[in-house]
Amino acid sequence: MKVWVCGPAIWMMPSESIYGGWPASGEIDLVEIRGDNMQEILSTVHYGSDPANHKYQGGTYLLSQSNNLNEVFHELAFIWEENSMKFILDNEYTVFELTSSQIGFEENYPFNEIFYLIVNVAVGGNFVGNYVNNNDLCYAANASNCPDNKRFLIDWIKYETL
């Protein structure tokens, strides 16, 4: 088996698919990291009537080399209000903001429903683009012999109603 790269993510899916299956009821990607690119933070929302009509809007924030995801903890705030959402990094930088009218929803806006939080690390896939460092790949049959230098550390998660 060959394991390529890890992609940490914090995202949200609807508790109920009120408007139909993915992406009709929405998906909110609070933060996604592409493989070894520790300077790029992606935030995205997914929507559309069905997979063939999948649409998304998102933002990217580039960190400096000295402030990258390997060096320091970062705080991501997600301000979620009726018909709008905002992604803020380190209480200072707006990564992305969106309103229902920006994406053409006058009614049936899926992001006003209840969503649940997912914290995961994806292994493999095609999302990582060209951010794979081949020196980090483990080709050993027994993966326990490989150096384990990848981590997805979360200091805290806080949820509050404003």
State where each predicted segment sits.
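GH16 jelly-roll
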Residues: 1-162
